[in-house]
């Protein structure tokens, strides 16, 4: 049995320690998209990091490439790291996507967001905020996210969002610690009748 919290934690560690920039969570047995829009003059090559070759799913028909990115069919549900090699005039880059599938009580919703245009037409439809992920056994977790506007609406966790999330946790813990110190001092002064 898989729990999305386990995946979120594992993928978060991978994202902050590895080379990945985006972590995409998708519901199993539903279509999924690694979203990367580029202009017609831009060349994009997708690579499976496990093999260093083009993804095997392209040859067996469980995924395909379009101007929107790398699409996975509902029949595909294998976690893995995929790299998009972007080649433009005087510009070369690599976008890393770690794909994680959630199997139980996973809910995806369509979402539309403003377009953010990157270098020379490379664009990403992203919107940052907090996303409520419902897991098995009625567990819920608020996670930092960047939502793709595709109908499959995968949850994408970026390094920036993870940093914000960790900062929020640190701030909350600091406030609780400060509050605890105030309560302790208050009780101490009451004990001595000050």
Swiss-Prot record:
The keyword Glycoprotein applies. Signal peptide: none annotated. Glycans are attached at residues 19, 60, 75, 87, 125, 138. Keywords: Early protein, Glycoprotein. It comes from the Viruses. It comes from Canine adenovirus serotype 1 (strain RI261) (CAdV-1). This is Early E3 22.1 kDa glycoprotein.
């Amino acid at each position: 049995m898989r729990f999305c919290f386990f995946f979120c934690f594992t993928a978060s560690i991978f994202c902050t320690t590895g080379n990945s920039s985006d972590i995409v969570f998708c519901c199993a047995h539903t279509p999924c998209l690694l979203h990367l829009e580029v202009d017609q003059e831009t060349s994009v090559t997708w690579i499976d990091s496990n093999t260093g070759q083009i993804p095997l799913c392209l040859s067996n028909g469980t995924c395909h490439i379009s101007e929107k990115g790398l699409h996975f069919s509902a029949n595909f549900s294998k976690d893995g790291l995929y790299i998009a090699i972007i080649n433009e005039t005087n510009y070369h880059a690599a976008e890393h996507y770690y794909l994680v599938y959630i199997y139980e009580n996973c809910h995806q919703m369509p979402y539309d967001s403003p377009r953010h245009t990157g270098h020379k037409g490379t664009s990403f439809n992203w919107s940052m905020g907090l996303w409520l992920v419902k897991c098995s056994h009625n567990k819920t977790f608020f996670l930092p996210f960047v939502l793709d506007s595709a109908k499959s609406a995968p949850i994408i966790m970026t390094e920036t969002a993870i940093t914000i999330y960790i900062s929020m946790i640190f701030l909350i813990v600091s406030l609780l610690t400060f509050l605890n110190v105030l309560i302790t001092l208050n009780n101490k002064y009451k004990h001595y009748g000050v």
